[in-house]
C-alpha cells in the first residue's frame, strides 16, 4: 500500500476523530469547538548546529541547513522542518522560494492533507524537503486538534518503533 492510499484509509479514522465529540484514550469524552479559520504558513531559515560531526566518505560537517515551518490554525500551531543535506541538491534558497509561493490560506480544513499535497504538487514538482516540512506541520497540527499523538491515531506501540536515523553508503 502506498502512502496516499494509506492516508486515504487512515482518513476515515480522522473523520471520526475530528467529529464534535471524540473519546479520549484517557478520561471522559471531550467536546471540540467548531473551527472556522484558515491555514497560515510561516517559515524561517535556520542553521542547525549538530551535536556530533556528521561524517560521510566524501565529506564531514557540523551544521546543516534547515527551515523551520509553522502552520497556524485557530490558535494552534503545527511545526515542521525542512532539512537539506547538501548531497540531496536542495538548499535554503530553493525551499524558501517554494514555500513563499504557497498560499495555504485558501484551505480552511487542515485535515484535507491530500488536497494540500495535490496543491503543492501543482505549484512545482520536486521540492521534497519543502513539501515534507508542510506535511510534518499538518500532521503535528491535526494531532493537536485531536489531542492525540499520531502513534495513537494509527494504533501503534511506540516501544516497537524501529530506529530510523541511519545513513548507509
Predicted regions and their residues:
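Catalytic beta/alpha-barrel core
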Residues: 169
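N-terminal export signals
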Residues: 5-27
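Metal- or metallocofactor-binding catalytic centers and their adjacent structured scaffolds
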Residues: 35-43, 72, 77-146
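Flexible hinge/switch segments at interdomain interfaces of large molecular machines
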Residues: 154-159
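C-terminal segment of N-terminal export signals and the immediately downstream linker at the start
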Residues: 21-55, 62, 72
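N-terminal secretory signal peptides
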Residues: 1-2
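Hydrophobic faces of well-ordered beta-strands that scaffold small-molecule active sites
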Residues: 162-166
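Conserved N-terminal beta1-alpha1 strand-loop-helix module at the mouth
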Residues: 64-66
Amino acid at each position: 500500500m502506498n502512502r496516499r492510499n494509506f492516508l486515504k484509509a487512515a482518513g476515515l479514522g480522522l473523520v471520526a476523530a475530528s467529529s464534535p465529540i471524540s473519546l479520549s484514550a484517557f478520561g471522559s469524552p471531550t467536546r471540540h469547538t467548531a473551527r472556522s479559520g484558515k491555514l497560515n504558513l510561516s517559515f524561517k531559515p535556520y542553521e542547525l548546529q549538530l551535536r556530533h560531526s556528521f561524517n560521510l566518505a566524501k565529506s564531514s560537517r557540523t551544521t546543516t541547513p534547515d527551515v523551520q515551518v509553522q502552520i497556524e490554525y485557530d490558535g494552534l500551531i503545527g511545526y515542521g522542518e525542512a532539512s537539506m543535506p547538501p548531497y540531496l541538491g536542495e538548499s535554503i534558497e530553493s525551499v524558501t522560494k517554494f514555500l513563499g509561493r504557497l498560499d495555504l490560506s485558501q484551505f480552511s480544513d487542515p485535515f484535507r492533507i491530500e488536497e494540500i499535497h495535490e496543491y503543492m504538487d501543482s505549484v512545482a514538482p520536486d521540492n521534497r524537503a519543502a513539501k515534507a516540512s508542510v506535511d510534518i506541520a499538518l500532521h503535528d497540527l491535526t494531532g493537536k486538534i485531536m489531542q492525540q499523538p499520531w502513534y495513537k491515531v494509527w494504533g501503534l506501540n511506540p516501544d516497537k518503533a524501529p530506529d530510523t536515523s541511519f545513513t548507509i553508503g
